[in-house]
From Swiss-Prot:
Binding site for Zn(2+) 2: 97, 113, 117, 124
The organism's taxonomic lineage, starting at the top: Eukaryota, Viridiplantae, Streptophyta, Embryophyta, Tracheophyta
Compartments it resides in: Nucleus
Tissue and organ distribution: Predominantly expressed in axillary buds and young panicles.
Protein name: Protein SHORT INTERNODES 1
Any one Gene Ontology BP term: regulation of DNA-templated transcription
Subunit structure: Forms homodimers (via C-terminus). Interacts with SPL14/IPA1 (via C-terminus).
Amino acid composition bias (Gly residues), ranges on this chain: 1-10, 83-92
Organism: Oryza sativa subsp. japonica
Length: 315
């Protein structure tokens, strides 16, 4: 082995050996060192590990350091773990804005947030106009809607009090009082249509009441008048002599045919008027006279089917 003294210590002191050229660590992996006792010792050279810290930020423009052969596997594995962890974090947090660093919109092709995208003037369809309305404008809008609802309710309900259109109106039972008809009300209704007492001029026809084969039948007078569009007809029965009627509290004037109506009549004076001596105020009214005889006359205006009694006695 050239370059190493193999002799004793005296020989080395008297004849010094020539200097040994330096050996590069890559050319020799081990060195032999001589001790003072003359023996040799083999020493393995330790490789220098590159200094690397996982928490140091490395920029994209910087070139990565060249790892040694021994630490290539460990650095590559650490980088793989770091890249996988970073990929998981990137998937959860999304992409960052290229200008401000805030979170960018996922579908934005410019990889920027809404503020930076709008400030740069990019025509991005992802960043639409915000629909958020300030509280002051929302309050003003609510007041306008309430005023419109109140005006609509006032227009629909007339002068009634305004109410909230969202509330349901309260159902109020109708306070109706049932009306009952009494005799007094009916009398008032009849009195409004016809006068209470009227003396009328009419024609009376003498008729016989009783069986046909009876010689002495009851004599009565029959008449009919039309007052106010209504036909009134009836038969006046014999109640006895006038003296008895006066003694009983009545007179001939009490048996006048009192009807309701007005107007004039072409008929003759009644038999009761002749008996009473023409006393009392007589109200002339239009009268429809019933003719009991089969001979047609100017006053035969009664409908067919009315029972008539002829005044001719049987032979």
């Amino acid at each position: 082995m050239a370059g190493f003294p193999l002799g004793g210590g005296s020989h080395s002191r008297d004849n010094p050996a020539p200097p040994v050229p330096p050996v590069h660590p890559a050319d020799a992996a081990s060195f032999l060192y001589a001790t003072r006792g003359g023996s040799f010792q083999l020493w393995q050279q330790q490789e220098q590990q590159p200094f690397y810290a996982s928490n140091i930020i490395r920029f994209a423009d910087d070139a990565p350091p060249a790892p040694s052969l021994a630490g290539a596997s460990s650095s590559s594995s650490s980088r793989g773990m770091r890249s996988s962890g970073g990929g998981g974090g990137g998937g959860g947090g999304g992409i960052s804005c290229q200008d401000c660093g805030n979170q960018a919109k996922k579908d934005c092709t410019h990889m920027r947030c809404r503020t930076c995208c709008k400030s740069r003037g990019f025509a991005c369809a992802t960043h639409v106009k915000s629909t958020w309305v300030p509280a002051a404008k929302r309050r003003e809008r609510q007041q306008q809607l309430a005023a419109l609802a109140a005006s609509a309710a006032a227009t629909a309900g007339g002068a009634g009090p305004s109410r909230d259109p969202t509330k349901r109106p309260r159902a109020r039972p109708s306070a109706t009082t049932p009306t009952t008809s009494s005799g007094d009300q009916q009398m008032v209704t009849v009195a409004e249509r016809f006068p209470r007492e009227v003396s009328s001029e009419a024609v009376f026809r003498c008729v016989r009441l009783g069986p046909v084969d009876q010689a002495e039948a009851e004599v009565a007078y029959q008449t009919a008048v039309s007052i106010g569009g209504h036909v009134f007809k009836g038969i006046l029965h014999d109640v006895g002599p006038e003296a008895l009627a006066v003694a009983g509290g009545g007179g001939a004037s009490e048996y006048h045919f009192r009807l309701t109506g007005d107007g004039s009549s072409p008929s003759t004076a009644a038999a009761g008027e002749a008996g009473s001596g023409g006393g009392g105020n007589i109200i002339v009214s239009s009268a429809v006279v019933m003719d009991p005889y089969p001979t047609p006359g100017p006053y035969g205006a009664f409908p067919a089917g009315t029972p008539f009694f002829h005044g001719h006695p049987r032979p």
